[in-house]
From Swiss-Prot:
Residues 86-97, 265-277, 284-309 have a biased composition (Low complexity). GO terms for cellular component: Golgi apparatus; plasma membrane. It comes from Mus musculus (Mouse). Residues 83-154, 167-320 are annotated as: Disordered. Keywords: Cell membrane, Glycoprotein, Golgi apparatus, Membrane, Signal, Transmembrane, Transmembrane helix. The chain crosses the membrane at residues 343-363. This is Uncharacterized protein C11orf24 homolog. InterPro entries: DUF5585 (IPR041056), Erythrocyte_Invasion_ImmMod (IPR052660). Pfam families: DUF5585. The keyword Transmembrane helix applies.
Amino acid sequence: MWTALVLVWISSVLLPRSHMMSAEPRNIVTNKWPKAVNQSMLRDTVPRTDNTFTERTAIVPPAPVTLTTETWAATLNSTRVTAEVTTHGTNTSTPTTREGTTDRVTSRTLAVPTSSGPSSAEQTRPTTIAGLPSLSTPHAEVPRTNASVSPRTAMAATVAPHTATLAAGTVNTSDPHTRTPSPAKSTPTDTSSKNPIPTSGAQIQGTTVQLTTDQPVHSTAGRSALSPSNATLEPTTTQVQTKEPSASTVPARATSLSPDVDVISPTTQPSPTLPTQGTGGPGTLLTTEQVGTKTTSGTASAGPTSRSSGDIKVPTTDSCQPSTQGQYLVTIDALTPSLVNKMLLLVVLLVGVTLFIAVLVMFALQAYESYKKKDYTQVDYLINGMYADSEM
């Protein structure tokens, strides 16, 4: 009983102290306090259960001193561990963080041992402060990491001008590209005007091409008459026609000139309107020539159809008539199978209905016979059999 009372009194004395220590800020090892108390209590009480009550009372006062020293040693160890963890964290995080964050981390770790405690713990504080230079060394390493960060920022700064020079390079390259299209566009037009010369394969066409290259500059700039425009457009039509039909004869070319003049005549009407919009630029002349060649290519594609028919207006009506006749024929072909299918369906329906009626009649006859024979007995069946045999 006395031992139990002593233990209760010791626990009642030590528990308020533990609560007071837990109320202080940055007391990380408050959970370890009861464990240390229990261990110290077991060490002090278990071997001395046989002693007298006076010895137990003498044991009580030194117990808190030993507990405080042990707990503060535990707290120092905990602070060192946390400081090491934080320094490792700063070493890993310094490449991305700033100096202010590392200073804050070190200040937090240094603020841990400054917590208030008993006098026995104050004697141990100078040892902890003397031991904290190990903590200050990572703080000395922090500017190194910052210094290592600064060359990276310098590298980033050096990269920035590279990017700026690249952007300038792109701008400079884009400027010549924007400047070059005008000669680039002019050169393909010249090549397009020169390409038909070897493809024509005739000396007469070569002379006509020279006339076209010389005439549009003078005729479109100064002359607005339709006769030179017709003269210039005729050889272009011959060139396009020589490109499309690979194996075309010379008389066919001669015959193609007469219908093509009628087809190109509407194209000559918009040609004088174009120089009225812009007469002072050679670029407009090139565009008019390109449009003329495109229109003649379209007319040339229509040219072979006119040759096959012979006339210009009649083939259009002929081409429309066969299409309509074909449509009528297709509709007639579509109607005849539909009628045949309807007749077949009707025949199948009639045959099916007749078979169904025949089956119903057969079932009705069998039902009627069975209805007559419902009152027959075995003797009747024998008599009927005898009569049947006699009849046979």
